[in-house]
Every structure is written in structure tokens, then in C-alpha cells.
Amino acid sequence: MRWQEMGYIFYPRKLR
């Protein structure tokens, strides 16, 4: 489980 895939839901602004 990568936080980037599931973390994007919590921190979509950091990835996007």
C-alpha cells in the first residue's frame, strides 16, 4: 500500500 495512491485522498494537494 503506497501512501501516494491512498494518501492522495488525504493529501491530494501535495501530489497535485
From Swiss-Prot:
Compartmental location: Secreted; Mitochondrion; Nucleus
Keyword annotations: DNA-binding, Mitochondrion, Nucleus, Osteogenesis, Secreted, Transcription, Transcription regulation
InterPro entries found in the cross-reference section: MT-RNR1
GO BP term, pick one: skeletal muscle tissue growth
Expression tissues: Detected in plasma (at protein level). Also expressed in skeletal muscle (at protein level).
GO molecular function annotation: DNA binding; DNA-binding transcription factor binding
Gene Ontology cellular component annotations, sorted alphabetically: extracellular space; mitochondrion; nucleus
Phenotypic consequence of K14Q: Specific to the Northeast Asian population; associated with increased susceptibility of sedentary males to type 2 diabetes; increased plasma levels of MOTS-c peptide
Induction context: By exercise. Up-regulated during cellular senescence.
Superkingdom of the organism of origin: Eukaryota
Subunit structure, interactors included: Interacts with transcription factors ATF1 and NFE2L2/NRF2; the interactions occur in the nucleus following metabolic stress. Also interacts with transcription factor NFE2L1/NRF1.
Role summary: Regulates insulin sensitivity and metabolic homeostasis. Inhibits the folate cycle, thereby reducing de novo purine biosynthesis which leads to the accumulation of the de novo purine synthesis intermediate 5-aminoimidazole-4-carboxamide (AICAR) and the activation of the metabolic regulator 5'-AMP-activated protein kinase (AMPK). Protects against age-dependent and diet-induced insulin resistance as well as diet-induced obesity.
Other comment: Increases survival and decreases bacterial load in mice infected with methicillin-resistant Staphylococcus aureus (MRSA). Reduces serum levels of inflammatory cytokines such as TNF and IL6 and increases levels of the anti-inflammatory cytokine IL10. Enhances the phagocytic and bactericidal ability of macrophages and suppresses MAPK pathways while enhancing activation of STAT3 and AHR. Protects mice against lipopolysaccharide-induced acute lung injury. Reduces body weight loss and pulmonary edema, inhibits neutrophilic tissue infiltration in lung tissue, reduces inflammatory cytokine levels, increases levels of anti-inflammatory cytokines and superoxide dismutase and down-regulates the expression of chemokine CXCL1/CINC1 and adhesion molecule ICAM1 in lung tissues.
The protein, known as: Mitochondrial-derived peptide MOTS-c
Species in which this protein is naturally found: Homo sapiens (Human)
Gene from which the chain derives: MT-RNR1
